[in-house]
């Protein structure tokens, strides 16, 4: 159906006392992203014209964390209930738009469920998201007459009979802006909590003869809120289980779905194998037939076809062409690039460095601010000395170079194509093509040498 223009209000003013944290509750992360950011992203994907964020506790931290989002910041100086929070945002509502109310601590609400709620909202009425629980203790109950929603009664205000009702309010609703403002103006705090309940607008709408349509979410986890770290950890596992299931059904082999974390987005080819305790962060792309060993962390990187990443390797903001092998215990930092067939072995670190086709850095090496050609061998213990204490400098190594073990290349320096660097050499000047560079001191040998002994 054709929807009206819509704006979203996200309530995020709570202190989150039970989190026992100096960080505002809604900034605690789920799948590597602040809870409230999940909700903002859903609102934007839904096509919200404006997103009004009602805040109170930790406003400066919220504004810093969400500075890249186009938000209208609405201060709720005193936390006097959900109705009071909406009253603070009401001056920004247009009469001819729909207003969708969401919560910053309900992070798993889906765009699909919200779209169904939006579609179900009757003209002049309210769309209400509800669920049925076996144990509804503590939640507002949905009251009905002849099947029609008549109101919401908070648990503390409910009679014994009303507390037997299993259908409860999730707090998520949508209504017309003009209607919302009129109903908000009529709210009172005549209840056990002494607060202004947004739920009271349901009874006000019913009294006006307006229709209230209840919609259920696809999954209960979509409407579960977070008040403490235990609840947050449980939602994290729910989310990760759902993501793992999607990947398995799409052909990705997760050796143990319960020990895999996706904290971003994963684009992938066919025949991917991912071992246990792997973490994917940010935006990651895996080509066909990629294998990732246990304990790896891959963040904001592109991994080409037929690459193999051995256990306990960290890859961040890096690009690997086809058929590269890295690890175990390797670290690719931002700006690392491996061309086709390159190899980075154990205890090798790369940063802002390119390793050419078929080139190898087998072990115990640091390559920073370096450009390394094709078919280069980097011996164990090689270090590009790129920093003089104030500035960074570049090392350039041409094709077909052999770098012996325990070599230091003091940048800025260039090693020409086909050159050989002898083991133990400190390179401080450019090396010409096909030349041998060696800077070791001559070896001396003392016959019959006796080791020192400890004094008694």
Swiss-Prot record:
GO BP annotations, alphabetical order: cell morphogenesis; cell wall organization; lipid A biosynthetic process; peptidoglycan biosynthetic process; regulation of cell shape; UDP-N-acetylglucosamine biosynthetic process
Residues reported in the UniProt entry to bind acetyl-CoA: 380, 386-387, 405, 423, 440
Cofactor(s) essential for the protein: Mg(2+)
InterPro entries recorded: Bifunctional_GlmU, GlmU-like, GlmU_C_LbH, Hexapep, Hexapep_transf_CS, MobA-like_NTP_Trfase, Nucleotide-diphossugar_trans, Trimer_LpxA-like_sf
Region (N-acetyltransferase): 251-456
Known catalytic reactions: alpha-D-glucosamine 1-phosphate + acetyl-CoA = N-acetyl-alpha-D-glucosamine 1-phosphate + CoA + H(+); N-acetyl-alpha-D-glucosamine 1-phosphate + UTP + H(+) = UDP-N-acetyl-alpha-D-glucosamine + diphosphate
Pfam families listed in its UniProt record: Hexapep, NTP_transf_3
Keywords: Acyltransferase, Cell shape, Cell wall biogenesis/degradation, Cytoplasm, Magnesium, Metal-binding, Multifunctional enzyme, Nucleotidyltransferase, Peptidoglycan synthesis, Repeat, Transferase
EC annotation from Swiss-Prot or TrEMBL: 2.7.7.23, 2.3.1.157
Catalytic residues as annotated in Swiss-Prot or TrEMBL: 363 (proton acceptor)
GO molecular function, one term: magnesium ion binding
Top-level class of the enzyme under EC nomenclature: transferase
Domain of life according to the entry: Bacteria
UniProt: Mg(2+) binding residues: 105, 227
Free-text cofactor note: Binds 1 Mg(2+) ion per subunit.
Cellular component terms (Gene Ontology): cytoplasm; membrane
Family: In the N-terminal section; belongs to the N-acetylglucosamine-1-phosphate uridyltransferase family. In the C-terminal section; belongs to the transferase hexapeptide repeat family.
Function: Catalyzes the last two sequential reactions in the de novo biosynthetic pathway for UDP-N-acetylglucosamine (UDP-GlcNAc). The C-terminal domain catalyzes the transfer of acetyl group from acetyl coenzyme A to glucosamine-1-phosphate (GlcN-1-P) to produce N-acetylglucosamine-1-phosphate (GlcNAc-1-P), which is converted into UDP-GlcNAc by the transfer of uridine 5-monophosphate (from uridine 5-triphosphate), a reaction catalyzed by the N-terminal domain.
UniProt name for this protein: Bifunctional protein GlmU
Lineage, top ranks: Bacteria, Pseudomonadati, Pseudomonadota, Gammaproteobacteria, Enterobacterales
């Amino acid at each position: 159906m054709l929807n009206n223009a819509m704006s979203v209000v996200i309530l995020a003013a709570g202190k989150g006392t039970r989190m026992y944290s100096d960080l505002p509750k809604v900034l605690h992360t789920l799948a590597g992203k602040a809870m409230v950011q999940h909700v903002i992203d859903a609102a934007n994907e839904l096509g919200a014209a404006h997103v009004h964020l009602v805040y109170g506790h930790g406003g400066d931290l919220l504004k810093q964390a969400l500075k890249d989002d186009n938000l209208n910041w609405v201060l709720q100086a005193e936390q006097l209930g959900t109705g009071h929070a909406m009253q603070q945002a009401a001056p920004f509502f247009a009469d001819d738009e729909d207003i969708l109310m969401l919560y910053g601590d309900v992070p798993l609400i889906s765009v699909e469920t919200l779209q169904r709620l939006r579609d179900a909202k009757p003209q002049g009425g309210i769309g209400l998201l509800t669920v049925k629980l076996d144990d509804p203790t503590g939640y507002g109950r949905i009251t009905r007459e002849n099947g029609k929603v008549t109101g919401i009664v908070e648990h503390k205000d409910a009679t014994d009979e009303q507390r037997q009702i299993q259908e409860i309010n999730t707090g998520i609703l949508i209504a017309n802006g003009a209607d919302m403002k009129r109903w908000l103006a009529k709210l009172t705090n005549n209840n056990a909590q002494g607060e202004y309940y947004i739920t009271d607008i349901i009874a006000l709408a019913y009294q006006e003869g307006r229709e209230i349509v209840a919609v259920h979410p696809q999954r209960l986890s979509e409407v579960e809120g977070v008040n403490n770290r235990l609840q947050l950890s449980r939602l994290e596992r729910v989310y990760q289980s759902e993501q793992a299931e999607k990947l398995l059904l799409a052909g990705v082999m997760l050796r143990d779905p319960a020990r895999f974390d996706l904290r971003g987005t994963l684009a992938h080819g066919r025949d991917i194998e991912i071992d246990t305790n792997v973490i994917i962060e940010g935006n990651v792309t895996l080509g066909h037939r990629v294998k990732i060993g246990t304990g790896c962390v891959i963040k904001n990187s592109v991994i080409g076809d037929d690459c193999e990443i051995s256990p306990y390797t960290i890859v961040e903001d890096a690009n690997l062409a086809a058929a590269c092998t890295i690890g175990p215990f390797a670290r690719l930092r931002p700006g690392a690039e491996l061309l086709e067939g390159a190899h980075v072995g154990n205890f090798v670190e790369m940063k802002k460095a390119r390793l050419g086709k078929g080139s190898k850095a087998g072990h115990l090496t640091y390559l920073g601010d370096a450009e390394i050609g094709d078919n280069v061998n980097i011996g164990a213990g090689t270090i590009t000395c790129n920093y003089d204490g104030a500035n960074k400098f570049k090392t350039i190594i041409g094709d077909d170079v052999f770098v012996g073990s325990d070599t230091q290349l003091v940048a800025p320096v260039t090693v020409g194509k086909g050159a050989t660097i002898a083991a133990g050499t400190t390179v401080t000047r450019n090396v010409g093509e096909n030349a041998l560079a060696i800077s070791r001191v001559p070896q001396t040998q003392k016959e019959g040498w006796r080791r020192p002994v400890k004094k008694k």
